[in-house]
Structure formats: C-alpha cells, structure tokens
Amino acid sequence: YKLLRAALGADVPIIINPGSNTRLEMMSACDIAVTYESDATKYLSRTRQEIHPDQYQGLPSWRFWHIVHGITKENVDKVCEKADDIDVGHLYLTDQTFAVGTGSEDTPQEDPYDDPPSPWVVPKIRSWIKGVLPLEQRLSAVEAKVAAKEN
C-alpha cells in the first residue's frame, strides 16, 4: 500500500476487490474494499453479520463497496435499504446477471459486466447516492394513490 500510495499520490484511491468479507488487516492495504460481490437474492437473504461483519465497525462507510447484480424492479429498493442499514458507502447495482452455464467462472455464459445496467437502474442508484431514495419512494406511493382515485 505504501509503495502504491507513493507512486500514485494521494489523489488516486487504492481499491481492492476480494468480493467478499476480508480480514480486517486487509483494510490497511487499501482505501476502499469491495466486500460484497454477488446477486441480489443472496444480498437480501443474508444477515448483516454475513455481509458486513462487526469487525468493520468503527471504519467509515466510504471504505466499503458492494456490487450487487441481478437486481429487479421488485427488489431494487430493498437492496438499497439494506445497503443503507449496513452503512455501505459505495454501491454498484446492475440488473445484468451471472451464470456459468456452458462457460466457466472466468468466462461465464452470462456476465453482469458485459453490458451496462438497464436505463431504469440509473435513476435508482443516483437517488441512493444523493440520499433521496426514501423520499422518492414515498412520493411515488402518493402519486400511485392519486392516480388510482382519479380512475
């Protein structure tokens, strides 16, 4: 870390991607760690401790990045809520999926990084980043009720 920091300077973040929880000592080797990289169903079904263990308490949220693929319009809000509850500072969401299929782990049949997220994902993640997603959710619910009464 010290060699990289000296070579890159203070303005370049050093990010590691173990893709899952890592030893606390690894946090001294980076600025940000990707500590979750898997699908939305697993993200929602696992406990806080399984996704973001107590060993990370006391570290600022900006040090953690979660990558969640396979989100749907039905679960995206729950994924964002869980990221907020866990206090993760960075979140990458995509509706693209991972499936080994006839490929391999290195060259899967479906790779969530082959294509960008669908256009409907972008406003959700933008709202999460800005911290206004809960407000937008309440506004959408009110608009839906008004529309139902008008019909």
Where are these predicted regions, by residue range?
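Amphipathic alpha-helical oligomerization/assembly segments
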Residues: 134-149
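Glycan-processing catalytic domains of CAZymes
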Residues: 1-137
